[in-house]
């Protein structure tokens, strides 16, 4: 028997972050596919990561691979913390 989780009231704040251009394009496209805001998508990804879980199903990961190709995003997790901004 599935249980329905109650909505949890939170306080959100506006923040400005700098993020790699192609990565942002992919994230926005994923949010659009999932019919959610970019903020909701990012919260979900981070909360899953904090628990060592994947935020995406196998089907979603296939869609993300297609979006990465579409937007020319070649970065991988091993590239994190090694990105240098162009001047």
Go through each PLM region and give its residues.
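Short, basic amphipathic alpha-helical segments that act as recognition/interaction helices
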Residues: 34-61
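Short interaction-prone segments
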Residues: 55-73
